[in-house]
From Swiss-Prot:
Its EC number is 3.6.5.-. GO terms for biological process: ribosome biogenesis. GO terms for cellular component: cytoplasm. The keyword NAD does not apply. This is GTPase Obg. Residues 1-159 form the Obg domain. Mg(2+) binds at S173, T193. GTP binds at residues 166-173, 191-195, 212-215, 279-282, 308-310. Monomer. It comes from the Bacteria. Keywords: Cytoplasm, GTP-binding, Hydrolase, Magnesium, Metal-binding, Nucleotide-binding. InterPro entries: G_OBG, GTP-bd, GTP-bd_Obg/CgtA, GTP1-OBG_CS, GTP1_OBG_dom, GTP1_OBG_dom_sf, OBG_GTPase, P-loop_NTPase.
Length: 341
């Protein structure tokens, strides 16, 4: 499935139906009074969060959405039916912005959540509404009110518990495919991953969602490369898994480049809990591993884990560390006891 995380769409709610001019006509009643009904309200435009979606690709092919006009009023004081609504189905984590792509309208984070983006126009009054003591047979009715029209932006921020970050070829895609059922493209060249991938990790009876974010390079926050566009997807993550390839000559510099990009991007990304791990250690000798681990520890000031997605050495330790942090975060969010036995 192709991935699209941003789309501009044009929406319009339905016009209200017109009121009716009608008079009661029955046998033996020569002068029936007015009985024109009101017009129905126009249809609304809604955004609805549905399960099973993780892209906005449908909005690449259709950008214009218009709800139905309300039904016209009829005789016998019959109100026109309401116009049909239009529902924009979106994935969990979709944010909706005004046309300026800056002003937030709503943030949709739960399946079943919905938001009315445009309200249908009210129906017009039928002639029955205009009856007065001095005008018992009005021949006047109102047209319905026009619906609302606006352009909006849909922007998807994937909701994952953990986000994989690192330079291109840090082994993120290999890691994801090794620990989940996700099948991202894996190859020996930079920028293999061109859009985020999600996978579910299961370990020790626990599970969490892991996102593979396209590799960052120096200057990404200024638009260099492709990773800066997707940093928004890790804003909701509870923990960042920062991978540094053991094949990097200067692992400390590789770590610092990504940290700088996270800090420059802002939105508190650099404040998130981080697990630092040296990947692809199957390519190193025991002595080389220790040297690079020590070099990383000096700049990170925290423990540095090591693993190989190929040999699976150290892999479960990394997953358990991530699952532990995520579980603590979930308990804190629920206001429960954050201790884990």
């Amino acid at each position: 499935m192709k991935f699209l995380d941003q789309a501009k769409v044009y929406i319009r709610s339905g016009n209200g139906g017109s009121g009716a001019v009608s008079f009661r006509r029955e046998k033996f009643i020569e002068f029936g009074g007015p009985d024109g009904g009101n017009g129905g309200r126009g249809g609304d435009v809604w955004a609805l969060v549905v399960d099973g979606l993780n892209t906005l690709i449908d909005y690449r092919y259709q950008q214009h959405f218009k709800a139905k006009t309300g039904g016209h009023g009829k005789g016998r004081n019959m109100t026109g039916e309401k116009g049909g609504d239009v529902i924009l189905k979106v994935p969990v984590g979709t944010q909706i912005f005004e046309e300026d792509n800056t002003t937030l309208i709503c943030d949709l984070t739960e399946v079943g959540q919905r938001y009315r983006l445009a309200k249908g126009g009210n129906g017009g009054f039928g002639n029955l509404h205009f009856t007065t003591s001095t005008n018992r047979a009005p021949r006047r009715a109102n047209p319905g009110l026009a619906g609302e029209e606006r352009a909006i932006w849909l922007r998807l921020k994937l909701i994952a518990d953990a986000g994989l970050v690192g330079l291109p070829n840090a082994g993120k895609s290999t890691f994801l495919s090794s620990v989940t059922a996700a099948k991202p493209k894996v190859a020996d060249y930079p920028f293999t991953t061109l859009h985020p991938h999600l996978g579910v990790v299961r370990i020790d009876g626990r599970e969490f969602v892991l996102a593979d974010i396209p590799g960052l390079i120096e200057g990404a926050h200024e638009g260099v490369g492709i990773g800066d566009r997707f940093l928004g997807h890790v804003e909701r993550c509870r923990v960042l898994l920062h991978l540094i390839s053991a094949q990097e000559e200067d692992v400390a510099k590789a770590y610092q480049i990504v940290r700088h990009e996270l800090e420059a991007y802002g939105n508190n990304l650099s404040d998130k809990t981080e697990i630092v791990a040296l990947s692809q250690i199957d390519t190193l000798t025991i002595e080389e591993r220790k040297m690079k681990q020590k070099a990383l520890r000096r700049v990170t000031d925290q423990p540095v884990m090591m693993f190989s997605a190929v040999s699976r050495e150290g892999l479960e330790n990394v997953l358990r560390a991530g699952a532990h942090i995520i579980e603590m975060s979930r308990k804190e969010e629920m206001g429960g006891d954050s201790r884990i036995d």
